[in-house]
């Protein structure tokens, strides 16, 4: 009887763990990672790194790859929310970040800077799909 109880407990813990892993992260969490990674006036990031006198292309490539992953995650969340246009915008940002990572890996600064112009089109989506929340942050606009 005791063995059966232990087996049931282990199965319950495993099921809970699999369920939590499958849920993924929410959009707010993803966006809060994208902002500082891309960069803001308060928190310099990838776009400022590209403008440095001697850009660290290895770090830029790694950051752009991370940005690509985050936008792919955001695309999935927008798809779950049935927001096709926002999902398309996130997909375009993901592809642009991937192109930026690829160019940065070559070490060619001019090509890397040229690829930067396709990334960071955040305002188009934010202007249409986000609104302030009562806590001073932002939330997805009701569709």
Q: Predicted segment positions?
A:
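Bacterial N-terminal signal peptides that target proteins for export
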Residues: 1-8
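Sequence context surrounding c-type heme c attachment/ligation sites in exported
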Residues: 21-143
